């Protein structure tokens, strides 16, 4: 299967929200340009090397004044929810302006259950980052919003219970599940 820019971006968000490092093999680095610019604004670092992308999220701590979604090659609307989860953990105020789809902030209500401070008005979401999110019972209502809830759970203290995981499985075949662990894949 060819590398996917949305899946790659989501994994980079996992490194960002956990303030850790990962290596992506054969990512579509050229297609990630707009996303990587935002990642760098947040304080993330990356380096391409021999078909690998070395990603360091340890210094992700800067809010993003304004992030606007756009059609390719702009910032992908499908990475807006995952980035919202990351911005929820960066102290300071960030703003996302959704320019592609209406009603794209379904994950915001669920992230609020985890302690995120997000105000949605029309096509804008203002995120006032908090130091730490906390676990909660949350409901995925669509694929990318569900991915953002998993990311938030990775960066949260406590247990998060996610209902609606089947939405997420449609787009992320290698996320950890008990079945994958039983087969030695987790």
Question: For the regions a protein language model found, what residue spans apply to each?
Answer:
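A short, hydrophobic C-terminal helix/tail in secreted or cell-surface proteins
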Residues: 180-186
